[in-house]
Amino acid sequence: MEDKRKRGRRITDRITEAYYELMKIVAENNHERMFEYYVEDDEAYIFKIVNSSPAQETVYPVFKQNIDTYMSECPEDSIECFKKQLDKCLLRPMRTAFQFSFISEDGKSKPVEMYMISIPDLDKKVCMVVGVMFDIRDEKGLLDSLT
C-alpha cells in the first residue's frame, strides 16, 4: 500500500508540474503579469513570463507596510481596492477577483483584472498570496475581434 501512495504522490507532483508549465505558457501568450507575496518575509514580486521563465521582475520589500508608496501613482480607489482584497486573502485560504488601475513601467494607467489565491501552510495559516493580472483592454480587444 505504501508503494502505491508513493507512486500516487509522484504522479501528483508531475501533474502539478505540468499544470504549472501550462500556466506559464498561457501567462506568456496573454502578456499577463504574475504576483507573488510572501507573508513571513513581507516581500512581493511582480513579473511576467518570457521564454517560460520569470522576467522583468520587480521586488517590493516590506510590501504590506509600503503599499501606498509602491502604488502612489495609482488612483486612491485602486490602492484601497487592492489593499482590501489582499487583506481578505491573508485572513484565510481563498480566491478573489477584482479590477483596479495599475501604472505600468511606461507610466501609463492600465485598467487590469486581477485574480488572487491565498496559499496555506501545513497549519492552514496563509503563508503566500499569488495572483495574475492582465490588461482589461487586451481582453476586450480580443473579444471584439472574435465578434
Task: List each model region and its residues.
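PAS-family sensory domain signal
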Residues: I15-M71
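Short loop/turn elements at sensory-signaling interfaces that couple input to output
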Residues: M114-V129, F134-G141
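PAS and PAS-like sensory/regulatory domains
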Residues: E32, T96-F98, E105, K110-M114, ...
